[in-house]
Amino acid sequence: MAIERTLSIIKPDAVAKNVIGQIYSRFEGAGLKIIAARMAQLSRAEAEGFYAVHSARPFFKDLVDFMISGPVMIQVLEGENAIAKHRDLMGATDPKKAEKGTIRADFADSIDANAVHGSDAEETAKVEIAYYFPALNVYSR
């Protein structure tokens, strides 16, 4: 299996619930290493830039408004099969459809306030990581 990196964001709803540590424990318990992390209050421009691929979608404005509604925790995870592993930990986008024991089933309230974001593919992960972390701030360990 390949060692991969993926971008993970703990969204404003989960940060407000004070569950960052519980989510980090799940990452580490699954063998994912946190190799870069920072808390941020995203600006509208940052959120719009990050989610630009969705700019034509009807939910875009609500998504951006939500992502700037409070601080987020942004991290890079590294490990074997990190992208798929992280997506399995997150669960389905809609927490009502997420498997019991996943981050979204346990901590998310709705399809909009769904606790976490994760890269969906290796190419996306590279772009998303570069968006928030210049290479000099990411450390394999």
Swiss-Prot record:
The active site is at residue 117. GO terms for molecular function: ATP binding; metal ion binding; nucleoside diphosphate kinase activity. The keyword Cytoplasm applies. The keyword Methyltransferase does not apply. HAMAP family: NDP_kinase. SUPFAM superfamilies: Nucleoside diphosphate kinase, NDK. Its EC number is 2.7.4.6. Keywords: ATP-binding, Cytoplasm, Kinase, Magnesium, Metal-binding, Nucleotide metabolism, Nucleotide-binding, Phosphoprotein, Transferase. InterPro entries: NDK-like_dom, NDK-like_dom_sf, Nucleoside_diP_kinase, Nucleoside_diP_kinase_AS. It catalyses: a 2'-deoxyribonucleoside 5'-diphosphate + ATP = a 2'-deoxyribonucleoside 5'-triphosphate + ADP; a ribonucleoside 5'-diphosphate + ATP = a ribonucleoside 5'-triphosphate + ADP. PROSITE patterns: NDPK (PS00469), NDPK_LIKE (PS51374). Homotetramer. GO terms for cellular component: cytoplasm. It comes from the Bacteria. It is found in: Cytoplasm. This is Nucleoside diphosphate kinase. Its cofactor is Mg(2+). It comes from Herminiimonas arsenicoxydans. ATP binds at residues 11, 59, 87, 93, 104, 114. One of its GO terms (biological process) is UTP biosynthetic process. Belongs to the NDK family. Major role in the synthesis of nucleoside triphosphates other than ATP. The ATP gamma phosphate is transferred to the NDP beta phosphate via a ping-pong mechanism, using a phosphorylated active-site intermediate.
